[in-house]
């Protein structure tokens, strides 16, 4: 029995320590977020999602599992008022060099300064796995889709934090066990379901003598999908996030 009970006890102790540490991390995150908000910082959520070719075409290929197969990455940000007035970035993931990633983040910071003044930019660490649910409960989603790739696309949270502060902003990372405090997953779900349901309407077919071609208006498809996440929908989603924030501030304090 000794060899069986010891691993079990060890698992319970480790899990308990992890949960306690996770709760402290969440409370610290929420207190810092509230402090910045009370100091006049506007909250902006920054995220990214990968869009595989099969999602666009509706045709799955064996080559898509290869790391060399091209995957598009969409980067955007939003506030309680809706998508921020900044042109989203749609790039091939292989083209996202460190220099380009930093340039994108710098451009966003400058745009936020012009539109909102000082902001607290909330994102997920690129090393964090994305969990749709959480231990205490699950947020309803718009549908079941493959998990989003971790954000942020920027090479280093620390370098982005320095860039944010240089522009008068602050950067916060949502604790990994509380990703439903991060509303971008709902927006990406909305976008991808729009792509699935409407991709045929954005495809043109040309038939020649010996072959046929299909042209997909990819950029237009993405823009229309983004527009489906309206300011009113953003308001509902972020109000839900605020309720969770208030709940954990009360229960974890």
Would you name each region that the model predicts?
Residues 1-253:
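Short functional hotspots at interaction and active-site rims
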């Amino acid at each position: 029995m000794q060899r069986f009970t010891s691993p079990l006890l060890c698992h319970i102790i480790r899990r308990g320590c992890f949960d306690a540490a996770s709760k402290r991390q969440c409370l610290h995150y929420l207190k810092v977020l509230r402090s910045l908000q009370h100091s006049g910082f506007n909250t902006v959520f920054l995220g990214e999602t990968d869009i595989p070719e099969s999602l666009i075409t509706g045709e799955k290929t064996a080559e898509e599992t290869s790391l060399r197969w091209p995957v598009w990455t969409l980067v955007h940000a939003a506030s309680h008022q809706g998508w921020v007035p900044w042109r989203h970035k749609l790039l091939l993931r292989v083209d996202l060099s460190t220099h380009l990633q930093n340039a994108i983040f710098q451009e966003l910071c400058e745009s936020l300064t012009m539109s909102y003044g000082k902001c607290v930019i909330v994102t997920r660490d690129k090393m964090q796995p994305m969990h749709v649910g959480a231990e205490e409960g699950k947020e309803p989603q718009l549908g079941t889709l493959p998990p989003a790739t971790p954000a942020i696309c920027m090479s280093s949270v620390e370098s982005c934090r320095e860039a944010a502060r240089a522009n008068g902003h602050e950067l916060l990372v949502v604790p990994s066990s509380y990703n439903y405090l991060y509303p971008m997953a709902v927006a990406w779900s909305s976008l991808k379901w729009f792509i699935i349901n409407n991709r045929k309407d954005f495809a043109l077919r040309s038939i020649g003598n010996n072959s046929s071609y299909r042209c997909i208006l990819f950029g237009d498809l993405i823009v229309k999908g983004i527009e489906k996440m309206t300011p009113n929908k953003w308001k509902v989603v972020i109000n839900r996030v605020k309720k969770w924030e208030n709940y954990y501030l009360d229960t974890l304090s």
